[in-house]
Every structure is written in structure tokens, then in C-alpha cells.
């Protein structure tokens, strides 16, 4: 979904499938484009709309792109791998936005590749998840699924924490189990798991199984970006995960087990 100054823009289509877009440009010095990613087709729409605004004399155009598509392909390991994140960022850079706002990108590669990029503060959303989950530092913990997320978030939150060490089948990439390193309370405790993104939620399912075995009572999950595929995974089954918190950056479907925290966009 794409909005300009808070107004959603919808495309029509010609018989051949190409887009028919209409947008009456207001005579302003600045335009704010929000892109809540739903499909790759929106990239073409973004290009057309941005060029349209520029042709109409809008001097300052900001892009708010909380979720960055292709961010998982932030490196190449084999000669035949296509470095999609790099080429995607080159397209965004070619549009010459005055500022590009992103939220909790998957790695530092994203911010290194984008021009005039600014990170939206993720702490506000995690603080809200901490508040709503009811966990307290005196006897509960924050859990990070791997050492990478532990390094990424632990300096921001002064909370007892532990992190996971995944056991993978290196032929298939499937997670087979998980070990835990860090602080585990001796008495029963509640947990908030924190990470940047979830697809089907396999990592968090195995994390929750291990934490329950170690004495966790209520287990909550916060992910900044939540794909709709989470609804097809095991996290929706039973009460292993008590509740899930995410921002409105990506998820497009509702579920009683998920609280969506609205993004703060500055116009």
C-alpha cells in the first residue's frame, strides 16, 4: 500500500495489465510517501508516483519505508546468487528522495546501501510491547533468538536476558532444536522474545518450547515486521505463545492473538 501525505493511492489497470494511476498534485513544497509493502508491483507504482511528483515541481519528497523489501538477501554466497538488496537500493537511490526512513532493518547492509537514510526509533515500539506484556525486570527476562539479535537490542534495554543457539540441519536449513545461553531465573518467570522479523515463526516456536522447559510461564513475542505467513505457522496453535506484538509495517491480516502497534509517520 502506498500513501501520499496520508492519502492511499490505488492503481487501475489497462487491458494489457499495465498500471493506470491518477494523482492530483497539491501545490506544496514537500510530499511524504509511505510504502507499507504488500507486493513487488508497488515498486513500479512508487517509481511512477515519485517521478510524477518531481515533474509537477515538488522539491522535497520523503519516503517512509518501514519494512525494506529484499533485506534478507543482504549478501551473496555463490557466484549465481543475485544481490537483490543492492539492486533494489540502487533503484530507490535513483529516485533521489530527500530522506528515506526505515525501521529496524534486517542488517546494517541496508542502511549502508541507501542514500540519505534515517532509522526510525524501534525502542518506542518494544517499550510498548514490554508494557502491554506486563514483564518486569525484577523476575522476568527478555529472550533473543540468536546472538545477533542479542547484540542488536540488549544495549538498548536494561533487562535480564538470554539468547538462543540454533541447531540446524545444514543440508535443509531447517531448525532442529535450540540451546540457551544467558540468565535464566530459578523461579518460574515470564518472557518477552524480541526479534526484527517473523515469517512462519519456526525460530520462535522452538525458542518457546525450550523456554517452557526451563520454567517459563507466559511467553510473549515482539517482532518489528510480521509477515502474514505467521498465521499459517505453529505460533497460532495452543497457548505456547501467549501473545504477539508487531508494528503496522507489514502485517495486513488481523488475529486476536496479535496486537498491531501503529507506526508514527511525520508529515
Question: What kind of feature is each model-predicted range?
Answer:
Residues 1-267:
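PRPP-associated nucleotide enzymes
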